[in-house]
Amino acid sequence: MATSNHSSGAEFILAGLTQRPELQLPLFLLFLGIYVVTVVGNLGMIFLIALSSQLYPPVYYFLSHLSFIDLCYSSVITPKMLVNFVPEENIISFLECITQLYFFLIFVIAEGYLLTAMEYDRYVAICRPLLYNIVMSHRVCSIMMAVVYSLGFLWATVHTTRMSVLSFCRSHTVSHYFCDILPLLTLSCSSTHINEILLFIIGGVNTLATTLAVLISYAFIFSSILGIHSTEGQSKAFGTCSSHLLAVGIFFGSITFMYFKPPSSTTMEKEKVSSVFYITIIPMLNPLIYSLRNKDVKNALKKMTRGRQSS
């Protein structure tokens, strides 16, 4: 590899998920199956919400965007990972590497803010039900989504711009199965101090601040739910929040474990395994989490299925 990333011929080798040849085929089949389920599940959710007249409230508007984002950031990583199970050397150009990192960051950061926006929607629905249609109007929801995507583009641009000016001359092997920030920083022979500061600040805002906002919202939500006198009302309110709380916990828990831990607390091999969870498993689980416990989604799916059978 060239001693600097400014050469058009600069290349990296992705170490991959495992170095054991006997696991290549089983892992390929496993992640291919997961990716197929992810694509079918998220595309199905998007089309179901778009075509069903029942799924018009703002929560489903946000859910369709969540499915889109899950589909996108999974597609940025998983196809390349599947291809890399085949050749012996998993070569990726510097431009392809930076592009992969850029789009991955856009969608992962956007998902964090989107989950926070969805939490605000639940807060208004439960704590301010009489004002819900006014506060969560279509215009407000559209503005919120514009902010979500804008923040994703902004922070991803900051990270990748700083990454693109680094020189990589120590090694050409990335100890990961995709181009993530931390493995790339370890390969740089120029100062990464600014990159590390940006990672800490931006990561703190994107993860810790949004997590805190979610926790505060849920404190108000649970307080309002406990004030409901009927058991049926409490059960229904808890049901509307449980799916989102599970999705939020899995996503932010995985991200926090990956990027906000002591450097020596785990090996790179363990980091690969944990990153698989939020890159491939979470996008597959989200449509299931939101549909299995949601009567409106299940009823809309049944209605659409019956309509096709009758036609």
Curated annotation (Swiss-Prot):
Residues 47-54, 121-139, 218-237, 293-311 are cytoplasmic. Keywords: Cell membrane, Disulfide bond, G-protein coupled receptor, Glycoprotein, Membrane, Olfaction, Receptor, Sensory transduction, Transducer, Transmembrane, Transmembrane helix. One of its GO terms (molecular function) is odorant binding. Its main location: membrane. One of its GO terms (biological process) is G protein-coupled receptor signaling pathway. The chain crosses the membrane at residues 26-46, 55-75, 100-120, 140-160, 198-217, 238-258, 272-292. The keyword Transmembrane helix applies. Expressed in the tongue. Belongs to the G-protein coupled receptor 1 family. This is Olfactory receptor 8D2. It comes from Homo sapiens (Human).
